[in-house]
Swiss-Prot record:
Name by which UniProt lists this protein: DNA-directed RNA polymerase subunit beta
Gene Ontology CC: one annotated term: DNA-directed RNA polymerase complex
PANTHER family from the UniProt entry: DNA-DIRECTED RNA POLYMERASE I SUBUNIT 2
Gene3D superfamilies with a match to the protein in the record: 2.40.50.100, 2.40.50.150, 3.90.1100.10, DNA-directed RNA polymerase, beta subunit, external 1 domain (2.30.150.10), DNA-directed RNA polymerase, subunit 2, domain 6 (2.40.270.10), RNA polymerase alpha subunit dimerisation domain (3.90.1800.10)
Keyword Cell membrane: no
Stated role: DNA-dependent RNA polymerase catalyzes the transcription of DNA into RNA using the four ribonucleoside triphosphates as substrates.
The species this protein was found in: Porphyromonas gingivalis (strain ATCC BAA-308 / W83)
Entry similarity comment: Belongs to the RNA polymerase beta chain family.
InterPro entries reported in the protein's UniProt record: DNA-dir_RNA_pol_bsu_ext_1_sf, DNA-dir_RNA_pol_bsu_external_1, DNA-dir_RNA_pol_su2, DNA-dir_RNAP_su2_dom, DNA-dir_RNAP_su2_hyb_sf, RNA_pol_bsu_bac, RNA_pol_bsu_CS, RNA_pol_bsu_protrusion
Length: 1269
């Protein structure tokens, strides 16, 4: 058994009790948990997630409101297959979703229609595993969270080509039409609906109820109202009109055809706005029926609002009706039928909660931005919103407000798994509601039930396409535990509703000051996705509204509050205008700052402030980075570009056969292993009762109450995965690190393996390294390795490949798995069993048969008569051909597992199947009976002597009367599926126990039912396989890969290289005490890369190895030079790590001392075995007849245009002709050449290459006729 290792580390952190890290997978698990709310009783469920989807789509009624389908509750049943079975059979790990629906009739004519309550199956929904993944079609997938623009209002500015600043305000809803307000170069404000339809803002204001000019001017308090009298008007001569003077009158028109008289309202403009009052105007105004006129105010305030006057001038409408008609015409390009339909369009756009939804976030953001107090439950736009947005925009135009920073994290929020699923279920349920409504309308007088109305496929098809095809549903990166956990904590700005790589500019990708403690500034991919895909910081959490928060301690009057109340999580918006001190700022024992000036952050600035000015303090210096970056020791000494490479490459480290945790770590390694859920962890205190390589059995401690309510055994068995294939073909292979009789505590790690050792992450090995050139072999970052690394399996890893062969039913008959293959020697099939599958333990070489299969072959499809004769006389489908699966050219390994899945054999008689099924029914009925008896015994004991308070079912029918005593026969008669489990007695504790017992009973009963269904399926249908496939065979081959020349290796500081030479141990440079170094690295790789962390690590780890201790040096708060000197002195090593080395070949001392130390090195997943490839004879492209490209296609090397130039320059005409013809696409020539080589004849003359024919055909396609004479 593996000895347990003491991984207690010496920690150099100045903060001795930093905040505990939150659960690293919380972002996935909590979101999914909140989406389903399964642990919450239906009456207490929050209106979010799945419950909200149902609430939004139900009740469903038919068009006449006769029938109503109401939603009562939803629940899930146990999954049909376990996670392991789904992984091996290629199935989706899902649970059946069922809803309790109530159908009743409101029509008094339908007396015969009884109210029906039914449980309706709505389809299977993929269920998250305990480690935050989904198993879809046998592969583990992760739903990546999306970082997108938050709903709300955004103010921006752009520059016109003539230099004018244009301002805009955009309202982004959760669902519904976008509306944008923007100014133009003429200082007029327009509203754009859905980015295309343009109308003056005043037209929109009229359409939403501000009908007259007066109403619009009153909003902004821009006009003075003057009563129309001759005297008043005379006083105002010379002042400008702020609003039109209009005359409204009724015009009677007679219809020419019918002679009917129609009255129409007519409007005429008496005096236009912006006209000065003169004697002539006054006369006209007095003659109109106007009571008051509006004049410009004389105060300075109105000049700010010139944009409103300009817009009014552009406004073609004078009344609400005209405005509504104008909006309708703009949106629909047609005339409205009547006033109601014109009004409906604008209502539906922004004021209808069915079509428009700002969401909780949108309403919160708008209220916050515009200082409004609108009820958070109002999720549609209000007139107040629109007016305040226009006012803010006017302030922007007058430089009295500032535009929003779109990259500020208060303007971006996270869509987690739960929200993405909520959107998908919303689509699915809306579709389902439509079909339900249609079916209700068709069924007029029939009696029908909810099951008849609901089509279960609608929801599952939407959800399945989301998991299968959405850009955010990704094949999990499972190279090692770090890769897994990072993938689950990733945030992507790409995906539906997000940005696209091509359109994303520099600003979006850049690091922003609000990323501090929220998004890691280091970990992001290199390449086109840089900055668009980022990782959550170690302490970051996502708030209920979807904003990223980070914790700070409050500081009051220069004193840090270390109590639980002093620790709060802040969003980027809440952190604005706060001064934040660094996490390692020196404090005295009372929590006061020691220094008079404190280094702090204030928004994007870094001022030195007095302690009294500090508002908050970081909880830890590690807060700024993500998990991968926080794993790099001495990160503070590395250049950010190299740190980025380092954190990305650690995710590519393959799990080694003998991993070792780093001597110099950062203290986060243990937490990562526990939270990754890849190891087996004790659930609570208990004792190990059995251990072997394949399982661990633990008897957990249970209280008397827990013992009583449980139907489980006290001993829990954990099965250890052995060489399980991961998505990236690495292996998960766990070994126990506990012994029989050990006491275990909650959270204790019981196993190691899969890149962990002693409960800590162990991605690589600690190796002795020398920074010195070695005969030029480490030029350009190449790595020289000691042969000991190969011999002692330092960097040996095991990789498992899965090979699948499907047996189908073809037109010419059934394919068959067999070891009896035509024209194949007995020697080639010696390792195959009777099903043609290779035996476990067989050594595989290239070309070996893995799975033998024969397929019927015929020149043409058999006629029906032939088929009939063959069926009668049992003649096997005539000829068969070999369709076996053979090992690829680079495959060498050992078969570690084989599987065969078959649909139920047709040969089995119906009676034998029936017998087997009835036997199963009997067995499981007996198990259910025993379970029920145990339940009744427990309940009888609990209710002994107690008086009943009334036991009711869901329809409130009393089954055991209140005031009576509990009797065993009464309890036996109860159906626990429909019973209300609360308040059976007066004793609260008894009631809790009754509920717990019944819930546990129901859970076990459902599990037994699910198991019975499974067994019946196996008996009747066999294994679940895709349509058209009769059998499926799988072979797993393990390859043991030692490190070799061409493999890629790296340290944790972005120092990567390719192994260029493996040198015998005796030839490697050695230390004064005779120890040969393990690796020689080029010292020139350090200065220009500026990743000095590797030198610090090498020196400290060397001291650690000498003293047999391990260190934790957290980032930005790690070991100082003094700390390192102290340990190197203790170990008797040079402080700078420089020492004289001796040449392994001659034994002479090298002239200059070299830096020597111990560095943690990883072997990355880019191995030469996967890349090296050479083509002999292989496939050709169909049209050009040239060899294909790439290893996967067994392709050749392209001899391109530039390579041709090179041969032309040398005048190598024969080589050139050969390459361009017989070695490539001269079809006749290449077969002749092959023949000539086999027979030993001279090479034939090359013919015409096929590419010339392709060119000729293309020219013929252009209508040009050619002939080659």
């Amino acid at each position: 058994m593996t000895p347990t290792t003491n991984n207690k580390r010496i920690n150099f952190a100045s903060i001795k009790n930093p905040l505990f890290y939150p659960d690293f997978l919380e972002v996935q698990l909590k979101s999914f948990h909140d989406f389903l709310q399964l642990d919450t009783p239906p009456e207490r469920r929050k209106k979010e997630g799945l419950y909200k989807v149902f609430a939004e789509n139900f009740p469903i009624t038919d068009t006449r409101n006769n029938f109503v389908l109401e939603f009562l509750d939803y629940y899930i049943d146990p999954p049909k297959y376990s996670i392991e079975e789904c992984l091996s059979r290629g199935l989706t790990y899902s649970v059946p979703l069922k809803a309790k629906l109530k159908l009743y009739c409101t029509d008094p004519d339908h007396e015969d229609f009884a109210t029906v309550i039914q449980d309706v199956f709505l389809g299977p929904i993929p269920y998250m595993t305990s480690s935050g993944t989904f198993v879809i079609n046998g592969a583990e997938r992760v739903i990546v969270s999306q970082l997108h623009r938050s709903p709300g209002v955004f103010f921006g500015q752009s520059l016109h080509t003539n230099g004018t600043k244009l301002y805009s305000a955009r309202i982004i809803p959760f669902k519904g039409s976008w509306i944008e307000f923007a100014t133009d170069i003429n200082n007029v404000m327009y509203a754009y609906i859905d980015r295309k339809k343009k109308l003056p803002v005043t037209t929109l204001l009229r359409a939403i109820g501000f009908e007259a000019d007066k109403d619009i001017l009153d909003i902004f308090n821009l006009a003075e109202e003057v009563k129309v009298t001759k005297a008043n008007l005379k006083k105002c001569i010379g002042r400008k009109l702020a609003a039109r003077v209009i005359n409204t009158y009724i015009d009677d028109l007679s219809d020419e055809d019918t002679g009917e008289v129609v009255s129409m309202e007519r409007i005429t403009v008496v005096v236009d706005r912006e006209v000065e009052l003169t004697e002539d105007n006054i006369e006209a105004i007095l003659n109109s029926n106007t009571q008051t006129i509006l004049l410009h105010r004389n105060d300075s305030n109105t000049s700010d609002y010139s944009i409103i006057f300009n817009t009014l001038q552009k406004d073609p409408c004078n009344s609400e009706k005209e405005a509504l008609y104008y909006v309708y015409r703009q949106l629909r390009n047609a005339e409205p039928a009547d006033d109601a339909s014109a009004r409906e369009v604008i209502t539906n756009l922004f004021f209808s909660d069915k079509r428009y939804d700002l969401g909780d976030v949108g309403r919160y953001r708008i209220n916050k931005k515009l200082n409004l107090n609108i009820d958070p439950d109002i999720k549609v736009l209000t007139n107040e919103d629109i007016i305040e947005i226009i006012k803010y925009l006017i302030e922007l135009v007058n430089s009295k407000a500032s535009v929003d920073d779109i990259d500020h994290l208060s303007n971006r929020r996270v869509r987690t798994v739960g929200e993405q699923l909520y959107n998908q279920f919303g689509i699915g349920l809306a579709r389902m509601a439509r079909t339900v409504r249609d079916r209700m309308n068709v069924r007029d007088n029939e009696v029908f039930t909810p099951i008849d109305l609901v089509n279960a496929k609608t929801i599952s098809s939407v959800v399945n396409s989301f998991f299968g095809t959405n850009a955010l549903s990704q094949f999990m990166d499972q190279t090692n535990p770090l890769a897994e956990i990072t993938h689950k904590r990733r945030l992507s700005a790409l995906g539906p509703g997000g940005l696209s790589r091509e359109r994303a500019g520099f600003e979006v990708r850049d690091v922003h000051y609000t990323h501090y403690g929220r998004l890691c500034p280091i970990e992001t991919p290199e390449g086109p996705n840089i900055g668009l895909i980022s990782s959550l910081c170690v302490y970051a959490k996502i708030s209920d509204l979807g904003f990223i928060t980070t914790p700070y301690r409050e500081v009051k009057n220069g004193k840090v509050d270390f109590s639980d109340n002093g620790l709060k999580y802040y969003t980027a918006e809440e952190e604005e205008e706060k001064t934040v001190a660094q996490g390692n700022a020196p404090l005295d024992e009372n929590g006061r700052f020691v220094r008079e000036r404190v280094k702090a952050r204030y928004e994007s600035d870094f001022p030195l402030v007095t302690p009294d000015e500090v508002d908050l303090m970081d909880v830890s210096p590690t807060q700024i980075a993500s998990i991968a970056a926080a794993l790099i020791p001495f990160l503070e000494h590395d250049d950010a570009n190299r740190a980025l490479m380092g954190s990305n490459m650690m995710r590519q480290a393959v799990p080694l056969l003998r991993p070792e945790s780093p001597i110099v770590g950062t203290g986060i390694e243990g937490k990562l292993v526990k939270d990754s859920r890849t190891q087996i962890v004790a659930e609570r205190g208990g004792e190990v009762v059995f251990v072997d390589a394949s399982c661990i059995k633990i008897r957990y401690d249970r209280t008397a109450d827990e013992e009583f309510v449980s139907f489980d055994d006290a001993i829990v068995t954990y099965y250890l995965p052995k060489y399980r294939k991961t998505n990236q073909s690495t292996t998960i292979d766990l070994h126990p690190i506990c012994s029989k009789g050990d006491r275990v505590e909650a959270g204790q790690i019981l196993t190691e393996g899969y890149s962990t050792q002693g409960g800590e992450l162990a991605l690589g090995r600690n190796v002795q390294v020398a920074y010195m050139p070695w005969k030029g072999y480490n030029y350009e970052d190449a790595i020289v390795l000691n042969e000991r690394m190969v011999r002692e399996d330092f960097f040996t890893s095991v990789h498992v490949d899965e090979y699948i062969l499907e047996v189908r039913e073809t037109k010419r008959g059934l394919e068959e798995l067999t070891s009896d293959i035509p024209n194949v020697s007995e020697d080639a099939t010696r390792d195959l069993d009777e099903n043609g599958i290779v035996r476990i333990g067989a050594h595989i070489e290239p070309g070996d048969i893995l799975i033998g299969k024969i397929t019927p072959k015929g020149e043409s499809d058999p006629t029906p008569e032939e088929k009939l004769l063959r069926a009668i006389f049992g003649d096997k489908a005539g000829d068969v051909k070999d369709a076996s699966l053979k090992a690829t050219p680079s495959l060498r390994g050992v078969v570690i597992d084989t599987k065969l899945f078959s649909k139920a054999a047709k040969k089995k008689s119906r009676t034998s199947t029936k017998e087997a099924v009835s036997k199963l029914d009997e067995t499981y009925a007996k198990r259910q009976q025993q379970l029920h008896e145990r339940l009744i015994d427990k309940l009888t004991e609990l209710t002994k002597g107690k008086t009943c308070c009334g036991v009711k079912d869901y329809l409130n029918v009393e089954l055991i009367k209140a005031g009576s005593k509990f009797a065993k026969k009464d309890l036996e008669a109860l159906d626990f599926n429909v019973i209300q489990l609360s308040d059976w007695t007066n004793d609260a504790h008894t009631n809790e126990l009754i509920k717990a017992v019944a819930v546990n009973y129901l859970k076990h009963s459902k599990e037994i039912e699910a198991e019975l269904r499974r067994r019946k399926l196996d008996e009747t249908i066999g294994d679940e396989l895709p349509a058209g496939i009769v059998q499926m065979a799988k072979v797993y081959i393990a390859k043991k890969r030692k490190i070799q020349v061409g493999d890629k290796m790296a340290g944790r500081h972005g120092n990567k290289g390719i192994v260029s030479k493996i040198v015998r141990q005796e030839d490697m440079p050695f230390l004064a005490d005779g120890t040969p170094v393990d690796i020689c690295l080029n010292p020139l790789g350090v200065p220009s890369r500026m990743n000095l962390g590797q030198i610090f690590e090498a020196v400290l780890a060397w001291a650690g190895r000498k003293m047999n201790v391990k260190f934790a040096t957290p980032i930005f708060d790690g070991a100082s030079l003094n700390d390192m000197n102290e340990w190197t002195d203790k170990a008797g090593l040079p402080r700078d790590g420089k020492t004289y080395l001796y040449d392994g070949g001659t034994g002479e001392r090298f002239d200059q001392p070299a830096t020597v130390g111990v560095t943690y090195f990883l072997k990355l997943g880019h191995m030469v075995d996967d890349k090296m490839h050479a083509r002999s004879i292989g496939p050709y492209s169909l049209i050009t007849q040239q060899p294909l490209g790439g290893k996967a296609q067994f392709g050749g090397q392209r001899f391109g245009e530039m390579e041709v130039w090179a041969l032309e320059a040398f005048g190598a005409s024969h080589i050139l002709q050969e390459i361009l013809t017989v070695k490539s696409d001269d079809v006749v020539g290449r077969s002749k050449a092959y023949e000539a080589i086999v027979k030993g004849d001279p090479m034939p003359t090359p013919g015409i290459p096929e590419s010339l024919n392709v060119l000729l055909h293309e020219l013929k396609g252009l209508g040009l006729s050619f002939s080659l004479d």
